Amino acid sequence: MPNFAGTWKMKSSENFDELLRALGVNAMLRKVAVAAASKPHVEIRQDGDQFYIKTSTTVRTTEINFQVGESFQEETVDGRKCRSLATWENENKIYCKQTLIEGEGPKTYWTRELVNDELILTFGADDVVCTRIYVRE
């Protein structure tokens, strides 16, 4: 079983602004979000298939608790409430499908994968994919 536990700092980010645009976030809010999310701090606790993930930026902190294979509530990148279901896509990768609770929007998901001691995080909105690579602190 992969060990996602630890504190992580972002090494690189691709397509975050494009992701926010695909989610319908206006230009002014995108600028604020991109600046605030340029140095996120991520803390992950893991006990088998049980995860706690806390992501902190200068403007917002999000926390999620989930068990792989069980539905849970969280928010999309742009703050809309959704039901999510995380599953193991392979032995080192979690895939999480998000379904909006209210309203309509693009199909969203996230993945977290361990590759050579890096955490690869992807966010997707329809066919737009944002990739963020983290290293352990």
Curated annotation (Swiss-Prot):
It is found in: Cytoplasm. The keyword Transport applies. PROSITE patterns: FABP. GO terms for molecular function: retinal binding; retinol binding. The keyword Glycoprotein does not apply. SUPFAM superfamilies: Lipocalins. InterPro entries: Calycin, Fatty_acid-bd, ILBP, Lipocln_cytosolic_FA-bd_dom. It comes from the Eukaryota. Cytosolic CRABPs may regulate the access of retinoic acid to the nuclear retinoic acid receptors. This is Cellular retinoic acid-binding protein 1. It comes from Pelodiscus sinensis (Chinese softshell turtle). The gene is CRABP1.
